[in-house]
């Protein structure tokens, strides 16, 4: 099974783009060359701000969704403190208990 990664790319105007991939370097190069997400085209210099292994595709999709819901401040904290991402990932792996 190929591991999936979550990554954040910082644009020239300091915005953070969130995505998932099985190969961070390849995907980053695609974004750099304008062949990646339309949201990053024409945004100037891009830098890889954060990447971390997530596990399988299903978990990566859930992590991506959760990170995209975060505020800019929360995303900056995630970039600065790896423990924040570890907590987020752990919360996705813990099964939710539904009460009747």
From Swiss-Prot:
InterPro entries, A to Z: GIY-YIG_endonuc (IPR000305), GIY-YIG_endonuc_sf (IPR035901), UPF0213_domain (IPR050190), UPF0213_GIY-YIG_endonuc (IPR022992)
Pfam families to which the protein is assigned, alphabetical: GIY-YIG
The GIY-YIG domain, residue ranges: 2-77
Family indicated by similarity: Belongs to the UPF0213 family.
Full protein name: UPF0213 protein YhbQ
Native species: Escherichia coli O127:H6 (strain E2348/69 / EPEC)
């Amino acid at each position: 099974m190929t591991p999936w990664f979550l990554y954040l790319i910082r644009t020239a105007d300091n915005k953070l783009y969130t995505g998932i991939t099985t190969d961070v370097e390849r995907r980053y190069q695609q974004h750099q060359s304008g062949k990646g997400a339309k949201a990053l085209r024409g945004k100037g210099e891009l830098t890889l701000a954060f990447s971390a292994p997530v596990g399988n595709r299903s978990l990566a999709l859930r992590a991506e969704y959760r990170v995209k819901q975060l505020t800019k401040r929360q995303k900056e904290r995630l970039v600065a403190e790896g423990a924040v991402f570890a907590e987020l990932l752990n919360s996705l792996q813990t099964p939710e208990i539904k009460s009747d």
